[in-house]
From Swiss-Prot:
Its main location: host cell. Residues 1-283 form the Protein kinase domain. This is Pseudokinase OPG198. Both catalytically active kinases B1/VPK1 and host VRK2 repress B12 inhibitory activity in a B1/VPK1 deletion mutant strain. ATP binds at residues 1, 30. It comes from Vaccinia virus (strain Ankara) (VACV). Interacts with B1/VPK1. Interacts with host VRK1. Interacts with host VRK2. Transmembrane segments: none annotated. It is found in: Host nucleus. One of its GO terms (molecular function) is ATP binding. GO terms for cellular component: host cell nucleus. The lineage of its organism: Viruses, Varidnaviria, Bamfordvirae, Nucleocytoviricota, Pokkesviricetes. It comes from the Viruses. Pfam families: PK_Tyr_Ser-Thr.
Length: 283
């Protein structure tokens, strides 16, 4: 793909390819719409057709994150926006497939408490929508939460999970999956090989919140075995958990209550999103 100056998506839109932003399992390029503009305002994610996570991500954008459904859902609830990117193009070459979204800015790094509270509410709203569509995100971590012009975006839908079997019964808890992701933010269920359920998404968000509020995750730089051991212990002793996350004793009570509520959820339980959200809504 490096030899191409431009490519066309399935709707015939031309995308001019710029510098590489990231190279890992997939490659991210800066792209722009035409030759007259010098600004690369979009990002193209591209991978080989044999790479299933990118195909799953494209399908998820099309079937679950459609703009009309999002617009109706937010209007009914009086929500300004969800942290879900718009899709601007999908395409393929002989060997590759790709999609295009806006350049969504930098990793969210809050500068004040007010922005943290707002981010918590926005992310709970966003996860509630994804869960209402019968899926979980499965990969909530700081590098997947971006901000541009005071607007958050949750990216990377390559590890989404379907929550329900035929007949609308919840999937069973089975520890039979190969785990993947950043072990620092991974939920306990995922560590143990279970599919991420609603409580898992909210648990991972909680670990992001701890850092947003100025705390530290006590298991960072530990081996994966030690990380899961610590997380399981901390679920039993939440007071100790927050003593280690906030050694100066400045943990927000709203955050403590959020973690307490999330830790008590059953695997297949639908959370009380309103209750979680109200913790962070400032009058």
């Amino acid at each position: 793909m490096e030899s191409f100056k431009y490519c066309f998506d399935n709707d015939g839109k031309k995308w001019i390819i710029g510098n590489t932003l990231y190279s890992g399992n997939s490659i991210l390029y800066k792209v722009r719409k035409n030759f007259t503009s010098s600004f690369y305002n979009y990002v193209m994610k591209i991978d080989h057709k044999s790479h299933k996570p990118l195909l799953s991500e494209i399908r998820f954008y099309i079937s679950v994150l459609d703009p009309l459904t999002i617009d109706n859902w937010t209007r009914e609830r009086g929500i300004k926006y969800l942290a879900i990117p718009d899709l601007y193009g999908i395409g393929e070459t002989d060997d590759y497939m790709f999609f295009v979204i806006k350049n969504l800015g930098r990793v969210f790094a809050p500068k004040d408490t007010e922005s943290v509270f707002e981010a918590c509410v926005t992310m709970i709203n966003t996860l509630e929508f994804i869960h209402s569509r019968g899926f979980t995100h499965g990969k909530i971590e700081p590098r997947n939460i971006l901000i541009r012009n005071k607007r958050l975006s949750l990216i990377d839908y390559s590890r989404t999970n379907k929550l329900y079997k035929s007949g609308n019964s919840h999937i069973d808890y089975n520890e039979d999956m190969i785990t993947s992701g950043n072990i620092n933010y991974m939920c306990v269920d995922n560590h143990l090989g279970a599919t991420v359920s609603k409580r898992g998404d909210l648990e991972m968000l909680g670990y992001c919140m701890i850092e947003w509020f100025g705390g530290k995750l006590p298991w960072k730089n530990e081996s994966s075995i030690k990380v899961i051991k610590q997380k399981k212990e901390y679920k039993k002793f939440i007071a100790t958990f927050f003593e280690d996350c906030f050694p100066e004793g400045n943990e927000p009570l709203e955050l403590v209550r959020y973690i307490e509520l999330v830790y008590t959820l059953d695997y297949s339980q639908t959370p009380n999103y309103d209750r979680l959200r109200r913790l962070f809504i400032q009058d």
